[in-house]
Amino acid sequence: MRMLRALVGRPKKRQITSSEKDNQPKPSQSFVEGSSSPDFPDGVEVLHDCPDATVDICFVHGLTGDRITTWTAQGQYNPWPKTLLPSKLSKARILTYGYDAYVVRKSVPGSNRLIDHATNLLNDLTTDRVLHNAASRPIIFVTHSLGGLVCKKAILSSRNSPDAHLRNIFNCTRGVIFMGTPHKGS
């Protein structure tokens, strides 16, 4: 955590002007399009694209979170990785990954399984990196809570995959930042 703070510092809260409010889409409008469900935006979203990137940084949210609001400060419209990191890490492509992280919906237990989320992360991220000619680019994961477990399982699945293109995630992973991940259960 100290390394991340040293890298980006703490975001300062600022007031949003009325013209900024009018010109910026609300998160619910900007990232739900194309999602499989309006309840949660899933898959990979590029927060900052850099044509000559030397590293990908992928944020993976935790339990009951989503790929945008988990990383967005109260009163802000954009997530801090999108607003802060490009100025500090100019050669990084910033990604976020979303999945249905709700255990219970309307008093009905969810059927989501860790391995399913991990498989989707591995497949979606591999596809995105191939489409952006980034399959061999180093990648760093920043994870929170359940997202850390999803990420670990995806990396292990990548390592053990018989498919070379899926093994690239394992081979290119340079680090994982775990924040509040229950490695030994909750």
What are these regions (language model features)?
Residues 69-75, 107-111, 153-157:
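Short coil/turn segments at secondary-structure boundaries
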Residues 58, 95-97, 175-177:
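Hydrophobic/aromatic beta-strand patches that form the interior of the parallel beta-sheet core
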Residues 61, 116-186:
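Serine-dependent carboxylesterase/thioesterase catalytic core
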Residues 37-91:
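Short, surface-exposed "cap/lid" segments of acyl-processing enzymes
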Residues 87-104:
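Conserved alpha/beta-hydrolase
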Residues 66-68, 103-106, 149-151, 185-186:
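Short catalytic/ligand-binding loop motif for oxyanion handling, primarily in non-cytosolic enzymes
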Residues 1-37:
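Intrinsically disordered, low-complexity Ser/Thr- and acidic-rich regulatory segments
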Residues 63, 98-100, 182:
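Short beta-to-alpha linker loops that shape the active-site pocket of alpha/beta-hydrolase fold enzymes
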